[in-house]
Amino acid sequence: MADLRATYRLQLGAGLDFAAARALVPYLRDLGVSHLYLSPSFQARADSTHGYDVTDPGRISEELGGEEGFRELASAGLGVILDIVPNHMAADGENRCWADPALRTRFFDVDPVTGRHRRFFDIDQLAGVRQEDPEVFAETHRLALRLVRDGLVDGLRIDHPDGLADPAAYLRRLRSDGVERVWVEKILDPGEPLRDWPVEGTVGYEFLNDAAALFVDPAGEDVLTRVCPPSPPFPAIAWQAKLEQVRGTFAPEVQRLRRLSDAPDLERALSSLPVYRTYIPPAEDADRDALAGNPVRDLLLSGEAPKEFVTRFQQTTPAVMAKGVEDTAFYRYNRLLALNEVGGDPSRFGISVERFHGGCLERARRFPRGLLITQTHDTKRSGDVRARIGALAGMADEWAEYVRRWRSLVPDGAPPSWNEAYLILQTLVGAWPLELQRLEAYAEKALREAKVNTNWVEPDAQYERGVRDWCRGLYANRAFVDDLEVLAERVARAGECSALGQTLLKLTAPGVPDVYQGDELWALSLVDPDNRRPVDWD
């Protein structure tokens, strides 16, 4: 097993298969990387662009090069950490476990009353897997465990463990089956400790948010609060967004829970949890704190609730948090976009040096091999864009003057709204120079995620056309572009200092630094799919 020094995340796909990844090994070794950190590599849907829609966890992707190509990559001189997806598989005819009715009810979490399956978040095409069944675990992990035993894989990254019925039991099973190194994609609320699981640590979002907040000047908070569009406090926005998701997107999950128990005020209970999930039984102090004031607190902690209700409640809250906060509230509350990141709290405007060091000390004590990141395939923007936008807090008065000038460019009553425009303007400053086509794609996704004037289910084509026209008008406005370029240059200089500082911390703080593909150089990327564009390795 190779010594763990630094990992490098590769998003495999049509433009980057095992052979292409192998060609990068000499470059990455010279960079100081010890391990390739590969996106899911098992057989996925034929048109998959990411690998998380696995159809056969017992076979390595033929499109990426098959097992022979994987073995050649693993023997090229760097260790391998493999991202696996135990929570769900593709609900697709290509998946024999889904296509066979008998296997479907055995492998997947299917409601016997309605025939509906537990979904990954709101994606009907991804069905929840019953990893709590030992036979299902054995069948779906046979290949992954063999790759570890054969020395081809040094460790596993576990996607969305919070979707599993019992994450702790699952992780103990992995450890007992010989997997020594495991990292979990566990999203922690600021200040929430990782449970005492048999893992190396998380994939690093808590470090990302602390490092970003450390470089946000708290002196700019009042000015940025006054200059941004009027808005309720972030906790109120987040709660409302979660409640909307519970009543809409996750109505089928709520109905299933109601059949299991007459729990009081279930919608509010699902919307009020301040963390992604609890882990009952056994109930720890962290669970009791998270459930304080929750309508179902006594029911969950008493041990009297049906076991299936407790399990499904805990499997549902992570989806509510992810879709309500990450994918809705983060696009509605736009005071400083640098703080709107997975696992972050936009109402926390900067942190002290003492608090940052406290987090480092805790990591060194409990999980010294946890990953340290500044960007992933799931972040809302690259570390460099985040650093630039965060630098606005240190020049808040100057930013406010620009905002007051640009406010006249956003006519009332026409798309975009001032709040939407404020998001777009921050993005321009953070990612400039930015091609118009990329901005249009980002604006469309951001507005659909916000779900205020358009959305994914029923897009308002006319409204979105108006936003595109407004963006094009900005680029055609020479006076605006000249103004933007003056500010963007100043922000870029401050952002570079911040980004380099955060990178230095990533390379020296307790933990294992991870570099997202292409991020060893300046990378001005936005949310996916923008951050999954091909890297120019030349």
List the predicted regions and their residue ranges:
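Acidic/aromatic-lined carbohydrate-recognition and catalytic surfaces
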Residues: 1-121, 150, 160-224
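Metal-dependent catalytic core segments for phosphate chemistry
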Residues: 119-122, 198-199, 203, 209, ...
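N- or domain-start disorder-to-order transition segments that initiate the globular core
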Residues: 129-133
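Structured alpha-helical segments in the cores of large, soluble enzyme domains
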Residues: 136-149
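Conserved short loop/turn motifs at secondary-structure junctions
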Residues: 157-164, 425, 429
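Polyanionic (Asp/Glu-rich) segments that form extended negatively charged tracts
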Residues: 167, 180, 211-236, 241-262, ...
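Conserved phosphate/anionic-ligand binding catalytic regions in large, soluble enzymes, centered on
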Residues: 270-278, 325, 369-385, 424-434, ...
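Extended, charge-enriched "interface" segments that sit outside catalytic cores
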Residues: 290-297, 303-306, 370, 385-492, ...
